[in-house]
């Protein structure tokens, strides 16, 4: 399964309405609030989940998914371009982040659909 394949949701098949999806090991939420996002990040910070992903699907955004992994106070944030982007296939990532930096990237993405400072992220091909 590709990275985008794990973002299956409860949205009806063929539904092209924009929505936000919060996903982690424990499950997913098709209509998360900012509080839901912070609770998911707290689970990651406490080692109670392996990852947290936030996707803005069916929207006109350059970055479709932001995800985080990590443990013991050190996290990696990845930003994945949308399927229609010329940047498709690249993974932007920033390593060795503390919990506050990780929260900052997720908060900005939740509110604006953009990853602040993306130009300072490293890049690899998926």
Regions found by a protein language model. Give the residues of each.
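Acidic, proline/glycine-rich low-complexity IDRs
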Residues: 2-126
């Amino acid at each position: 399964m590709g990275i985008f394949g794990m973002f299956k949701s409860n949205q009806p098949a063929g539904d092209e309405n924009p929505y936000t999806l919060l996903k982690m090991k424990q499950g997913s939420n098709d209509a998360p609030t900012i509080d839901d996002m912070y609770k998911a990040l707290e689970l990651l910070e406490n080692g109670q989940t392996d990852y947290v992903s936030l996707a803005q699907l069916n929207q006109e955004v350059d970055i479709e998914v932001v995800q985080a992994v990590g443990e013991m106070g050190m996290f990696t944030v990845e930003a994945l371009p949308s399927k229609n982007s010329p940047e498709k296939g690249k993974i932007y990532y920033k390593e060795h982040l503390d919990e506050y930096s990780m929260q900052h990237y997720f908060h900005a993405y939740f509110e604006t659909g953009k990853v602040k400072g993306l130009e300072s992220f490293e890049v690899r091909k998926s």
